[in-house]
Amino acid sequence: MTLDDAALKSFGFIERPTKNMINIDPLQTGGILTEDARRALVEWGDGYSICDNCGGVLDLIKKPPVQKFIHEALPEFLGVDEVRITHGARESKFAVMHAIAQEGDTVILDGLAHYSSVVAAQRARLEIRKVPHSEKPDYHIDPEAYGTAIEETISETGKAPALALLTYPDGNYGNLADAKKIASVCHEYDVPLLLNCAYSVGRMPVDAKELGVDFIAGSGHKSMASCGPIGVLGVNNDNGDYSDIIFRKSPTNKNKEIELLGCTARSATLMTMIASFPEVVKRTRNWGNEVADARWFSEKLETMGLIQMGQKPHNHDLMFFEAPNLYEISTRVKKGRYFLYKELKSRNIHGIKAGLTKFFKLSTFEVGRENLSYIVDSFDEIIKKYE
Amino acid sequence: MTLDDAALKSFGFIERPTKNMINIDPLQTGGILTEDARRALVEWGDGYSICDNCGGVLDLIKKPPVQKFIHEALPEFLGVDEVRITHGARESKFAVMHAIAQEGDTVILDGLAHYSSVVAAQRARLEIRKVPHSEKPDYHIDPEAYGTAIEETISETGKAPALALLTYPDGNYGNLADAKKIASVCHEYDVPLLLNCAYSVGRMPVDAKELGVDFIAGSGHKSMASCGPIGVLGVNNDNGDYSDIIFRKSPTNKNKEIELLGCTARSATLMTMIASFPEVVKRTRNWGNEVADARWFSEKLETMGLIQMGQKPHNHDLMFFEAPNLYEISTRVKKGRYFLYKELKSRNIHGIKAGLTKFFKLSTFEVGRENLSYIVDSFDEIIKKYE
């Protein structure tokens, strides 16, 4: 590509095609900015804006109140001893794995783990052992299976796993496994547990000390109404001096934390997280209503012949549906498997991946009962249209 | 901290204290958003907005034109074979080091390397050998010294360094070392060279193939008028199949690149980079005028008794000054070493770190001759005021 004026016209400002649509993509519902965050975005949009008054350590900046946010508010919010900001949940997971494990060590992942947990372990050059889950429709994870996986690792490698990880909830079915029990099983073998809370921190209450987990990875862009990429990493030192290991400082650059490469998310990403924080805290207190909305929505779709997979009644806004009737329609209509996407799009609804009909996931988080009713009615209309 | 209403009032929307000031902090001048980027910021601010139409690989998204940007425009812009987006220059450097070196290998860094290069090497568990530079006032790096450092590494460890790195320009003096000659010296020993272009890509023309370097790390928030954190990583395969190594895919998740943890900078950060790109390309073509502005500014300050360190005449907007007269004033005035910061602040000028008087750096990039004249006059006024 020659970078002449004609070629450069492909870039510049570009509109977001889904703007103003009702978005039920699980990736999107928890990351919609609050009004305060929208203002912060413009205010702090310039590259390094947050560094205007930095003395050399991002998380100790006093103006704006980064220090207060990271060292006082977030530890309370997550129920941990220490927090740092990262570029996202996957970067939080990699940082923990890379810091506490040696190359070749084993990490235990739940069988429903997000691909980024797998890839983080591969980047850290660790062996992966998965904890199995039950089959369709429950996809249940038995806490005792963590013990089995740990014992198998010890018997096969002669060494305990360096870490165990649980996806809470998992990103396919929205199942919330018994984290407290799993932490307790892992701790019987002195294996620390990392909770991947990309879909929970910022949506629902999560407290590491209450659950007894050692590390929490959260996602700002997924669940904390923040402009991405940004995440949080919380460390609970109840079972070891973990924060000393993970946040160890450079021997040559004494105020720079090695695992964070000195500093991480800055400016608009961090300032939108700070801007949304009051509302994010408050919305986690409203979690009961969100779960009620999810259950109501699930019941409505099931009356139309769709089947919700995973825990039932469901405990999270992320839900996976099997839709044999929509699949059947797709086999005989002109637009084929794209018909559902197009029908929903024509009704201003986005978020079920184009081409999916038989299985798909969606999220009801903060969509609100009115829009959820509209979506339910839309499914009803679409199904009746092709019957 | 109890997260009650009173505590939460510390957060929410916060104003940027330096808004509307003339900012000459080298961190800030190249990261100021263009108008298109400011619009993109609002349009794409929601967490995962860019993923609306993602098929599983960030850099292959067609709508918005991410694929065209990363696979066509940026390779041309950087003079490389492959480009990926990262969270910043430091993350680009770590990705290269972590992917191509083994733990315990040596990396050669220029003696003026940014701390983040040091910390990236420490995170990758590499040994660091520094190439010395000449002393004050030039801080010159002799290309042949890279050969010496490589030979010393081989003789001491029995193994060639895995990588050499040059900071181009360095972040203290704004010196542009002879990258082409250094690349040639490194290649005599088959050692690849990474150019840290955090202060060059997006400000001035940089072409990896022309310079013969193997890797380029650039910074969106520092020099490409982007909302941070975001960076670029360019790979030139002329001397090895480096992109196959660095962008290797997961054996289990076949379309996910391990070293990037699947995907990196998303949404507003990437969309502001795309939005600013046409203007960024054009401004690099105006680099001659920026250098002329820097030289003019340097000469003006030198007539007042300040001394510019580093290359002279200077070749970059980032400049380091020694100011014995301002230091002398600081020893006898009431506000002590904060007097300069306060005097400049009262004149709406920000960017020289609070408390510095004897040595400081600044940047003239895109400040414009009118504002530069105003800054020159302000220094003149301040010096005369305390004489």
Curated annotation (Swiss-Prot), chains A, B:
Species of origin: Methanococcoides burtonii (strain DSM 6242 / NBRC 107633 / OCM 468 / ACE-M)
Catalytically driven reaction(s): O-phospho-L-seryl-tRNA(Cys) + hydrogen sulfide + H(+) = L-cysteinyl-tRNA(Cys) + phosphate
GO BP field: translation
GO MF annotation terms: Sep-tRNA:Cys-tRNA synthase activity
Enzyme Commission no: 2.5.1.73
Transmembrane segments: none
SUPFAM superfamilies for the chain: PLP-dependent transferases (SSF53383)
Enzyme class: transferase
Gene3D superfamilies: Aspartate Aminotransferase, domain 1, Type I PLP-dependent aspartate aminotransferase-like (Major domain)
Domain of life: Archaea
Keywords per UniProt: Protein biosynthesis, Pyridoxal phosphate, Transferase
Functional summary from the UniProt entry: Converts O-phospho-L-seryl-tRNA(Cys) (Sep-tRNA(Cys)) to L-cysteinyl-tRNA(Cys) (Cys-tRNA(Cys)).
Assembly and oligomerization: Homodimer. Interacts with SepRS.
Cofactor: pyridoxal 5'-phosphate
PANTHER family: CYSTEINE DESULFURASE (PTHR43586), O-PHOSPHO-L-SERYL-TRNA:CYS-TRNA SYNTHASE (PTHR43586:SF3)
Residues annotated to bind pyridoxal 5'-phosphate: A89, R90, N196, S219, G220, H221
Protein name as annotated: O-phospho-L-seryl-tRNA:Cys-tRNA synthase 2
InterPro entries recorded: PyrdxlP-dep_Trfase, PyrdxlP-dep_Trfase_major, PyrdxlP-dep_Trfase_small, Sep_Cys-tRNA_synth_arc, SepSecS/SepCysS
Similarity comment text for this entry: Belongs to the SepCysS family.
List of residues that carry N6-(pyridoxal phosphate)lysine: K222
One Pfam family matching this protein: SepSecS
